[in-house]
């Protein structure tokens, strides 16, 4: 039957209870296995499961979201705490994945609720962010706190730690790949808040230094590169890690590697056994960030990753079919605490917001810094005193603005071309749940 009609569900009904028969049936991918005597309701359940499952799952999912829609809406009218925002974002991502998997027609309803949530989240960040920066003991876990609060305690407890930073990994992308790891690891999921701007130069350096950007520039001026300079902005990460370990009087040896393609991962796999002697190993993988930028610049990649679901699908396919999957299998054998995180997420933008500045203004579409910026104040979080947020101020009159929601900055010159080119691209640097609430995952190898 499977040879003739491979997609036809086959249900085996038998009196035979021998385990090897069951194993053969399961190995042949039968749809169900019933042992006589069979109750009529068992037959009905099997028929429903194999003939009407899609419709039933879709109906139950839609009903579940309709019920939760009202509860989420009520929450958005309240003053949520940082932890409550994390939980609300988890629920929105849960429904996004559930509705996408059932082909539901409720996508527009969810999209509008996410836009409302992001507008409220931006107000929340504007209200609290400066206080978080100025009072580290009163803030949620943020980029500069990761080593101090997540990694050092494990090292102190005698655990070996492997920190894997997947640049530009969003929470929904993590959920898409997490199923690939469930057989090898016990998974503990959390989210943390990135700093602003949600860009690699700032957020990843803050993670590795354990400091805010202005503090890095003041303490290690030779390791910080300002926006207007041409050299790479993240070339000193290993040195920043070393300085952070030194500041906290940690004596552990560490390794650091940055990988941009599958070939580099394959090469690393040949050295994996050498990591076993090192307490802390740090690995940065840039594939998702490269994919995000390629999607903007390449028409073909934009078509392949045209929607949020397609973007997740490419991430999942990359994880499943490249040496990165083998890397995780080998790490599972080394008995490490494996921490997966990222420096920032990204958001699909489709609302242009005009901005005017001089020629020295940076090129990022979600945040700008410079002098004499002209913009729509309702569209941004404006920071006229960067030092209050511990951000560098290359010139005394430099101000920062951060885009909120799904907006992106566009210049009046050649405006229509600019808008058409960047609409529906994934960008980062501003304020949204997708950019700021990012995965912090702990994996522990399962005992065999």
Regions found by a protein language model. Give the residues of each.
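Conserved phosphotransfer cores of two-component systems
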Residues: 1-7, 28
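Conserved two-component signaling phosphotransfer/partner-docking surface
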Residues: 19, 39-44
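Feature captures the catalytic ectodomains and active-site-proximal regions of enzymes
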Residues: 12, 23, 32, 44-448
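A Lys-centered signature of the CheY-like receiver
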Residues: 14, 36
């Amino acid at each position: 039957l499977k040879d003739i009609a491979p997609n036809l569900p086959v249900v085996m009904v038998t009196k035979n209870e021998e385990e090897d028969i069951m194993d053969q049936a399961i190995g042949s991918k039968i749809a169900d296995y019933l042992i006589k005597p069979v109750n009529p309701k068992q037959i009905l359940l099997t028929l429903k499961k194999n003939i009407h499952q899609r419709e039933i799952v879709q109906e139950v999912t839609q009903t579940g979201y309709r019920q939760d829609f009202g509860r989420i809406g009520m929450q958005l009218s309240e003053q949520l705490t940082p932890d409550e925002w994390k939980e609300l974002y988890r629920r929105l991502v849960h429904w996004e994945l559930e509705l996408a998997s059932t082909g539901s027609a409720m996508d527009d309803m969810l999209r509008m609720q996410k836009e409302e949530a992001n507008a409220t989240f931006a107000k929340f960040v504007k209200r609290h962010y400066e206080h978080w920066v100025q009072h580290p003991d009163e803030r949620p876990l943020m980029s500069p706190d990761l080593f101090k609060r997540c990694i050092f305690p494990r090292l102190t407890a005698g655990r070996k730690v492997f920190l894997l930073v997947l640049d530009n990994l969003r929470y929904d992308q993590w959920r898409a790949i997490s199923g690939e790891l469930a057989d090898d690891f016990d998974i503990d999921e959390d989210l943390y808040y990135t700093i602003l701007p949600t860009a690699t130069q700032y957020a990843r350096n803050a993670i590795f230094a354990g400091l805010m950007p202005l503090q890095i520039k003041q303490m290690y001026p030779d390791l910080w590169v300002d926006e207007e300079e041409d050299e790479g902005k993240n070339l000193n990460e290993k040195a920043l890690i070393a300085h952070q370990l030194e500041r906290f009087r940690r004596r552990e040896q560490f390794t650091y590697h940055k990988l941009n393609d599958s070939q580099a991962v394959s090469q690393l796999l040949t050295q994996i056994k050498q990591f076993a002697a090192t307490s802390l190993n740090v690995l940065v993988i840039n594939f998702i960030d490269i994919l995000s930028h390629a999607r903007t610049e390449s028409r073909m990649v934009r078509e392949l990753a045209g929607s949020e679901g397609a973007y997740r699908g490419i991430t999942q396919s990359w994880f499943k079919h490249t040496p990165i999957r083998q890397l995780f299998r080998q790490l599972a054998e080394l008995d490490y605490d494996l921490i997966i995180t990222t420096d920032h997420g990204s958001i699909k933008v489709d609302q242009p917001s005009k901005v005017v500045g001089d020629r020295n203004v940076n090129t990022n579409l979600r945040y700008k810094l410079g002098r004499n910026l002209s913009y729509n104040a309702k569209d941004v979080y404006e920071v006229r005193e960067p030092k209050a947020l511990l951000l560098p101020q290359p010139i005394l009159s430099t101000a920062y603005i951060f885009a909120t929601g799904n907006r992106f900055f566009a210049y009046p010159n050649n405006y229509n071309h600019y808008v058409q080119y960047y609409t529906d691209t994934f960008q980062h640097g501003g304020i949204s749940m997708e950019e700021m609430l990012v995965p912090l995952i702990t994996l522990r190898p399962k005992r065999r």
